[in-house]
């Protein structure tokens, strides 16, 4: 679980997301979407370990983990992950843009831009 900062217009918020390399798209809770005043761009079906769910989709201006940042990224909006105590999933759409490593001693996720 990592702290993730989101920015959208004049709004920003931080949530604790589970790192999920198996998730194709980053998913955020409805609380995060509400704090960011995200507008739904429609709904789509997503298939995950818990089955098929309908999710709203929104566009976030910036998503940041530490110094790693991606601009204008589409996210799924759904509260199902909240049942596990997370505010979302940090998916491969974000993680795949970086080389990832885990520093076990410091208990940190290290994200380095791909060359």
Name these PLM-found stretches.
Residues 1-115:
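Pepsin/retropepsin-fold aspartyl endopeptidases
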